[in-house]
Amino acid sequence: MVLEFTKYQGLGNDFILLDNRQQTTPLVTPEQAIQLCDRHFGIGADGVIFALPGQAGADYTMRIFNSDGSEPEMCGNGIRCLARFIDHLEGGNAPGKTYSIHTLAGMIRPRLETDALVRVDMGEPILTATDIPTTLKDSNGQAVNQPLEVAGKTWMVTCVSMGNPHCITFVEDVAAIALEVIGKDFEHHPAFPQRINTEFIEVVRPDYIKMRVWERGAGITLACGTGACASVVAGVLTGHCDRLCTVELPGGCLQIEWSAADNHIYMTGPAAISFQGQVTL
């Protein structure tokens, strides 16, 4: 089978985008996605994203396979790339166009902005510990500033779901974290029955933070949109951050707002095409 694809990246978090509008099942299997994402023997990417027909009243449906073949509920950087890909498939739209996209995390609405930016209504954060899910829990039934033993050290963590689970911890120097060593220990900790994405945050000032991430199913990546959203929520809950905050990631910056008016998280960041091609499976 010859497969046409388009490669996109959002802050260096890169994806293979497939036009899957003609059928409701993904064009490739998780095993094939692993091959496509291989950076030595495949195209190379953090995941494969499928633009499927809409369901539940949505314009489109998004599914994604990670580079290890697992399927996350949603991906913040990925949905910005998908919005730009859909715009390309439809022949281009003026800035301000909004799409409704059905995901395993619910309905997400990205809006095209100028200068290749996309603003995404990410919905409300999930804070109830059992819904994230995590076995960590405070007296309010949330997991805010809770101790977690990892790699012989006690970390104070806050857990938030943006449709996918996140564990956030605040550190003095994010560059000093041996992410390649402890990332998997967090991901597979028994406190997280569905595994976890982990964000390490250095607060520069209340409206500016630095973040590094270990993504569930992908490992170290240059950016994570849902992680940036979850980190600002965690920062507000623990008194570290303002509700409007710039998040600096290795791949660039995202603007995150946790609106007090509607409790929704709004993420603004870039998405750009890298190249197009064909691959034989």
Curated annotation (Swiss-Prot):
UniProt entry keywords in alphabetical sequence: Amino-acid biosynthesis, Cytoplasm, Isomerase, Lysine biosynthesis
GO cellular component terms listed in the entry, alphabetical order: cytosol
Catalytic activity: (2S,6S)-2,6-diaminopimelate = meso-2,6-diaminopimelate
KW Isomerase (keyword) present: yes
Enzyme class (EC, first level): isomerase
Family annotation (Gene3D superfamilies): Diaminopimelate Epimerase, Chain A, domain 1
Active-site residues, Swiss-Prot/TrEMBL: C75 (proton donor), C224 (proton acceptor)
Site-annotated residues for Could be important to modulate the pK values of the two catalytic cysteine residues: H166, E215
Function: Catalyzes the stereoinversion of LL-2,6-diaminopimelate (L,L-DAP) to meso-diaminopimelate (meso-DAP), a precursor of L-lysine and an essential component of the bacterial peptidoglycan.
Official protein name in the record: Diaminopimelate epimerase
